[in-house]
Amino acid sequence: MSVENKVLTNKVLTAAAMVTMVGGLGAAGTLSASAATPECGDSCIKIYSTEFGTSEQPNLVETVYQGVARVGRPTAMYPISNTDPAGDIVGHRKGLVTDFYKDGLVSAEVNRHYGNLTAVEVEYAPHGKRTGLCAGLADTAYQNEGLTLQKCGTSAKTVWIIDTADSPSTAPQGHFPLVSGSTTDFTHPYAMTATHSDSTRSRHQTTAPMQIRVTRLTGSPYHVPAGQLWGTTK
């Protein structure tokens, strides 16, 4: 594992958020007051984009649209809240990509490119109650596909790779691309992307304002755009 990956593993996949998840992305920062509902508390993590904020002031975080726990429900960027359970996200699983490959969740090609990196699944848990639904994709990743809730642990489509290798300069700050475990493009892999608008509709028409999407990663290794760099806080 590279120095950058060791730094990120220590900073991002740590503490209670990771233990609870056996997964989650971890805590790169801590807010002065809890940003989750009281029932979720320290088990929750908040996933933010550097397009909108920082670990100390994330502003917008990944949130389940209207809080509905249903397969196909979009996840989008909405204001951080300690009263709205729609933003309660916990870790479901973490491990090396090669571990997900051994369990049949990612392809041999994904393992060949990313095997030594960490991958995670993150689960919707309103008021701390797990739903078995993780942030993912309905189909194998394609350009502008929107993120939606999908059953955890069943395919590569809910697996997210912490791709420190493609943005080594931001890894020490706890910011990194999140590449879909179902990507089939390894030159410009499909990565989680936050945008200011939602003008492109998905094949399934399951859209929401500020819906998170996957788009081809650009700017690697030193100029990845802010909308494709992610971090976590508690």
PLM regions: where:
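Lectin-like carbohydrate-binding module/patch detector with strong preference for beta-trefoil
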Residues: 36-234
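Secretory targeting and sorting signals
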Residues: 1-35
